[in-house]
Amino acid sequence: METIAIHRHARSSAQKVRLVADLIRGKKVSQALETLTYTNKKAAGLVKKVLESAIANAEHNDGADIDDLKVAKIFVDEGPSMKRIMPRAKGRADRILKRTSHITVVVSDR
């Protein structure tokens, strides 16, 4: 049984979150949580919350055994970007893109 959890509009760029997502793809959830706990990146905290949510969904909604679960799929898509302005010299301005991402974690007992 596959169970999904999604975090939309996470305030980190998809490029940065994908570095962390690649670390846990295909691992058992216990090993993935341990990896994320000791990964020194902001994105690790974001991915860990989504993984914990997927585990809770599997346990509560599907009655799955946590020990059998593994990370079947994890992918990160780009979300909308917030446009901000950075004042520059001589009255000019640059546009700053505050990027967001959508993190999707699928856990499965197979």
UniProtKB/Swiss-Prot annotation:
Q: Does the keyword Ribonucleoprotein apply?
A: yes
Oligomeric and partner information: Part of the 50S ribosomal subunit.
Tell me yes or no: is RNA-binding among this UniProt entry's keywords. Answer: yes
Its GO CC terms are: cytosolic large ribosomal subunit
What name does the UniProt record give this protein? Large ribosomal subunit protein uL22
Q: What organism is listed for this UniProt entry?
A: Proteus mirabilis (strain HI4320)
Tell me which UniProt keywords the record has, alphabetically: Ribonucleoprotein, Ribosomal protein, RNA-binding, rRNA-binding
Q: Give the molecular function GO annotations.
A: rRNA binding; structural constituent of ribosome
CDD domains in the record, alphabetically? Answer: Ribosomal_L22
Q: What is the role of this chain? A: This protein binds specifically to 23S rRNA; its binding is stimulated by other ribosomal proteins, e.g. L4, L17, and L20. It is important during the early stages of 50S assembly. It makes multiple contacts with different domains of the 23S rRNA in the assembled 50S subunit and ribosome.
- Family membership, please give it: Belongs to the universal ribosomal protein uL22 family.
- Gene Ontology biological process terms in this record: translation
Task: Please name the taxonomic classification of the source.
Answer: Bacteria, Pseudomonadati, Pseudomonadota, Gammaproteobacteria, Enterobacterales
Write down the InterPro entries for this protein, in alphabetical order. Ribosomal_uL22, Ribosomal_uL22_bac/chlpt-type, Ribosomal_uL22_bac/org-type, Ribosomal_uL22_CS, Ribosomal_uL22_sf
